[in-house]
């Protein structure tokens, strides 16, 4: 079912429902702000990375970037994540690299494996996870992954990630009329906006950015996920390209490949792959976001007869299903590779500094105020 097509066809009926939904979310927000509903308010800074819509926008890569920044500056961080679709053996779950995606969720597991020195906690009740982290870890900083609407945790900074379509056709279209979780007034809580877009697209969005976001008086940064190469995916292989045991390659040298994605924005991954390799995939196998891959999926991929490329988010679920001989002839295993992605920041609006410089300045202010 094409949800967007249904929403467009039924727009006259759905708009009033969307307005009612936005009003309910605004009332909920007011209840938290008035202290009617309880909030976890730790003594250390809390930074939320979230979005206004459902689905993938690039939140988790930004959380990963912040974790790497914290590690480089000698700061401990605790991520409070919901763990979409996860079934943790206990709550909260302190995610370890050895956990499975079924236990922790694909994105928390990816963060834990990419940042083994960070604490990634999964619990749908993030207030509970925060209390546990404060009692057992006392980190310098809390990061809320997908936290914009999770108001049960007080935050010092809200970084809101937007898609280009949020600035055009989806602007202000709340559920069920569109994909937004809240109305436009909610963006007034943001301290910065990050738009996942290539520099050329970000610059082309200038008129929409001016019309939509100037009223909030906050900086707007662009970013993209840029592949640096490929990392072999298989059981027992380290997913981090710089670590011992990781098999890497810079390119496919013009060989054909199949792209497989179980993410929120598969078209963006297709465009990234086409740009990186210089040619499109033979096929693009698109699965739903957070798809729980099974042995049947792996058998299909093994039958492709060429390299199969996926995202790091897909890799954490596919790796356990692939033997240690993955990719070797005669093993009946797919020749599976994942992109080694790096977050790159591009042009900005209403800011004299880049996002890393802006963040460093904001952290200096937060840490001084909280005496971190």
Curated annotation (Swiss-Prot):
Q: Does the keyword Cell membrane apply?
A: no
Q: In which pathway does it act?
A: Glycolipid biosynthesis; lipid IV(A) biosynthesis; lipid IV(A) from (3R)-3-hydroxytetradecanoyl-[acyl-carrier-protein] and UDP-N-acetyl-alpha-D-glucosamine: step 6/6
What are the UniProt keywords, alphabetically? Answer: ATP-binding, Kinase, Lipid A biosynthesis, Lipid biosynthesis, Lipid metabolism, Nucleotide-binding, Transferase
Pfam families found in the cross-reference section = LpxK (PF02606)
Q: Name one GO cellular component term.
A: plasma membrane
- This enzyme's EC code(s): 2.7.1.130
List ligand-binding residues for ATP.
53-60
GO biological process terms, alphabetically, are: lipid A biosynthetic process; lipopolysaccharide core region biosynthetic process
Listed GO MF terms: ATP binding; tetraacyldisaccharide 4'-kinase activity
Catalytic activity, reaction form: a lipid A disaccharide + ATP = a lipid IVA + ADP + H(+)
Entry's HAMAP family?
LpxK (MF_00409)
- Matching NCBIfam families, A to Z? lpxK
Q: Which PANTHER family match?
A: TETRAACYLDISACCHARIDE 4'-KINASE (PTHR42724), TETRAACYLDISACCHARIDE 4'-KINASE, MITOCHONDRIAL-RELATED (PTHR42724:SF1)
Q: Hey, which family's this protein in?
A: Belongs to the LpxK family.
The protein in question is named: Tetraacyldisaccharide 4'-kinase
Q: Which organism is it from?
A: Nitratidesulfovibrio vulgaris (strain DSM 19637 / Miyazaki F) (Desulfovibrio vulgaris)
Tell me the name of the encoding gene. lpxK
């Amino acid at each position: 079912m094409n949800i967007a097509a249904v929403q467009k066809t039924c727009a006259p009926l759905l708009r009033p429902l969307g307005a009612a939904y936005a009003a309910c979310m605004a009332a909920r927000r007011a209840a938290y702000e008035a202290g009617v509903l309880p909030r976890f308010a730790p003594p250390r800074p809390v930074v939320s990375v979230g979005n206004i819509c459902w689905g993938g926008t690039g939140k988790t890569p930004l959380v990963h970037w912040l974790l790497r920044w914290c590690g480089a500056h000698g700061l401990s961080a605790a991520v409070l994540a919901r763990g979409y679709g996860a079934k943790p053996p206990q709550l909260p779950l302190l995610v370890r690299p050895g956990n499975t995606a079924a236990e922790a969720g694909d994105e928390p597991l990816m963060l834990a494996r990419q940042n083994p020195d960070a604490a990634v906690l999964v619990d749908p009740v993030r207030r509970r996870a925060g209390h546990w982290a404060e009692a057992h870890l006392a980190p310098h900083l809390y990061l809320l992954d997908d936290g914009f609407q999770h108001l049960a945790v007080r935050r010092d900074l809200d970084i809101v990630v937007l898609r280009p379509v949020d600035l055009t056709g989806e602007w202000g279209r709340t559920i069920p009329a569109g994909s937004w979780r809240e109305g436009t007034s909610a963006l007034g809580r943001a301290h910065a906006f990050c738009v996942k877009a290539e520099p050329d697209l970000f610059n082309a969005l200038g008129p929409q950015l001016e019309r939509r976001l100037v009223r909030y008086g906050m900086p707007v940064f662009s970013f993209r996920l840029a592949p640096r190469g490929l990392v072999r995916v298989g059981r027992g292989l380290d997913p981090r390209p710089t670590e011992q045991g990781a098999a890497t390659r810079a390119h496919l040298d013009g060989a054909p490949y199949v792209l497989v994605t179980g993410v929120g924005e598969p078209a963006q991954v297709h465009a990234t792959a086409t740009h990186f390799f210089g040619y499109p995939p033979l096929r693009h196998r698109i699965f739903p976001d957070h798809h729980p891959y099974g042995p049947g999926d792996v058998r299909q991929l093994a039958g492709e007869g060429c390299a199969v490329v996926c995202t790091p988010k897909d890799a954490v679920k596919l790796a356990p299903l692939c033997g240690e001989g993955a990719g070797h002839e005669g093993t009946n295993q797919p020749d599976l590779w994942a992109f080694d992605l790096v977050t790159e920041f591009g042009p900005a609006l209403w800011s004299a500094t880049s996002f890393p410089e802006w963040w460093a300045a904001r952290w200096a202010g937060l840490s001084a105020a909280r005496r971190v």
